[in-house]
Amino acid sequence: PNQTNEPDPNYVNYYERALYNHILASQEPDKGGFVYFTPMRPGHYRVYSQPETSMWCCVGSGLENHTKYGEFIYAYRKDTLYVNLFIPSQLTWKEQGIILTQETRFPDDGKVTLRIDEAPKKKRTLMIRIPEWANQSKGYSVSINGKRKMFVMAKGNQYLPLSRKWEKGDVITFHLPM
């Protein structure tokens, strides 16, 4: 994970919107071509690069965006781990002795599972980002090892602290309303 000051959920929400609505959308899913630019007009079409006929200079610099996927999924501050993005991944945080696996189909499905594969013998805090569009009234829920936890969170756009002595095999499951 990247060391950070306490992440501001406003910036993480912006990052997530840019990732899904611009960076991922810049690549054609079937053939892999890239857009030269993303038009702002409603209903406008995109033109994707073709390897033999249209490979623009900006396509090369746009490729850099796709290397950013894993950079901000997790961040840490001291011994606190922040889960910023919901992307299938595995984190090995050697300094804290934590190995964590995240499973999700987000944004197609709002279920996110974090599995503790290795944990230190001391209390640690996981800070789970609650997106600005999610809150309990819309069906947001969290369970640890199958037991639903109740939290007072009237709105999204904040981090949910989960502090405990984590053990190998612990599973955190949360559902984001989609």
Residue ranges of predicted features:
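C-terminal beta-strand-rich structural cap/linker in extracellular carbohydrate-active enzymes
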Residues: R124-M127, L162-P177
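Aromatic (Trp/Tyr) and acidic
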Residues: P1-R129, N135-S137
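Glycine/proline-rich low-complexity spacer/linker segments in large multi-domain proteins
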Residues: L81, K147, L176-M178
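Surface-exposed coil/turn segments at beta-strand junctions on protein surfaces, enriched
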Residues: P107, A119-K121, M153-K155, K165-E167
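Solvent-exposed beta-strand/loop surfaces of large extracellular or lumenal domains
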Residues: Q136-R164
